[in-house]
Amino acid sequence: MPFSPPCLDPAAAAAASLSFLPAAAARPPAPCAVAPRSRRALRVAASVATAPESAAAQGRLESLSQVAGVLGTQWGDEGKGKLVDILAQRFDIVARCQGGANAGHTIYNSEGKKFSLHLVPSGILNEKTMCVVGNGAVVHLPGFFKEIDGLESNGISCEGRILVSDRAHLLFDFHQTVDGLREVELGNSLIGTTKRGIGPCYSNKVIRNGLRVSDLRHMDTFGAKLNTLLRDAALRFEGFEYSTKTLKEEVEKYEKFAERLGPYITDTVHFMNQSILQNKKILVEGGQATMLDIDFGTYPFVTSSSPSAGGICTGLGIAPRSIGDLIGVVKAYTTRVGSGPFPTELLGKTGDLLRASGMEFGTTTGRPRRCGWLDIVALKYCCQINGFSSLNLTKLDVLTGLKEVKLGIAYCTEDGKEIESFPADLDLLEKIKVKYEVLPGWEDDISSVRNYSDLPETARLYVERIEELVGIPVHYIGVGPGRDALIYK
């Protein structure tokens, strides 16, 4: 559905302009006379929602399809976990379809307590929600049980509420060791992985010698299969060593894990399809994001799975026609952790300001995230691949205090020719110039706003311009980290 251009007063309209700047070297806007407040200062108590506003929120949530998905549209860290946590209250099942402990989802409970999850689905805070780890995920059992122990120590019951696919692959500690050795081997060309062993584990899956959760039911052959993996790693990497004693200790550890994991192990393909037949409501929680997709991302600076819409089907074993609404989560600016192209990256003071104000440090690694303006070209590319029905714009409050904000609306070659699609060529991506549209910023604290019409006019202009450029409506707007800090549009 087309969007009408937002109405502005003449002064605001005059403030919008276009500019060309080289990729990764965009000139930051002039600093504000008063520096934007910290995220902590922005966390004020939410105002009580009006009755019409509550009705709007209820309408948005109740209109979602039986099977819906929440996927990232950038390079991860968009804030998917918060939306999943909120939506989970209306769903019977929340499922992870791919990835592993490289995905860091930060959520807050009703008391404001922070939880950082990596493998357990974000729906776990909702006591009536069943959580599923699908066949497309890779499971590091020491980390999995550490998460469960942490949740239960905080009063969140996990017993009988988490199902793990018997087809999911097991990620071992040695995979993490190999991940680090691989990065060292790459030297200056390193990919910048989380070193959580994701790539090596998926590599074993693809060459068909990996161990799956179902192998824990056959501990008599488990040791021999694990020995094959360890031997291959030792042959491949000079710095990798293991002994018969190491193998024995690992097998003994997994014998205990097998006993503890037993109640969780399920044929989740059957469970998911039966749940669909029973009209259960299912919410799929994507890890990472489309720009990290093994096929569609900035290869080779990508993850080893498919965090796009296609990964839902292959990672859970459900049919494409069963999937309805897909919500794309996009930060109001762009961030990236690790190496790889980043056309709208800000290397100056504005990038530092966004990092500090947005608390942009990786949930999984703790590394500072690279920051830049919202990349509309990349966003449209992700929308094209996934077919999103709506968007969740997060962290709009972080832009408060900037005199002007920019949208990267086009890529151009060095000679000024506009590029029609998102390039696969990394050399081209590193050389492109970004065409920016400049919009006026806002000074008002928006962290307590819960009604779209109460946002500053220029903040609404920013949201509506994104809708107009992408052609997809923004239904949810994040203005803070808490559960309640969400505007339903």
From Swiss-Prot:
GO terms for molecular function: adenylosuccinate synthase activity; GTP binding; magnesium ion binding. Pathway: Purine metabolism; AMP biosynthesis via de novo pathway; AMP from IMP: step 1/2. Binds 1 Mg(2+) ion per subunit. It catalyses: IMP + L-aspartate + GTP = N(6)-(1,2-dicarboxyethyl)-AMP + GDP + phosphate + 2 H(+). Substrate binds at residues 363-369. Residues 1-45 form a transit peptide. One of its GO terms (biological process) is IMP metabolic process. It is an enzyme of class 6 (ligase). InterPro entries: Adenylosuccin_syn_GTP-bd (IPR018220), Adenylosuccin_syn_Lys_AS (IPR033128), Adenylosuccinate_synth_dom1 (IPR042109), Adenylosuccinate_synth_dom2 (IPR042110), Adenylosuccinate_synth_dom3 (IPR042111), Adenylosuccinate_synthetase (IPR001114), P-loop_NTPase (IPR027417). Its cofactor is Mg(2+). GTP binds at residues 76-82, 104-106, 369, 395-397, 478-480. IMP binds at residues 77-80, 102-105, 194, 208, 288, 303, 367. Its main location: plastid. Its EC number is 6.3.4.4. Keywords: Chloroplast, GTP-binding, Ligase, Magnesium, Metal-binding, Nucleotide-binding, Plastid, Purine biosynthesis, Transit peptide. Belongs to the adenylosuccinate synthetase family. Homodimer. Plays an important role in the de novo pathway and in the salvage pathway of purine nucleotide biosynthesis. Catalyzes the first committed step in the biosynthesis of AMP from IMP. PANTHER family: ADENYLOSUCCINATE SYNTHETASE (PTHR11846:SF0). NCBIfam families: PRK01117.1, purA. This is Adenylosuccinate synthetase 2, chloroplastic. It comes from Oryza sativa subsp. japonica. The gene is PURA2.
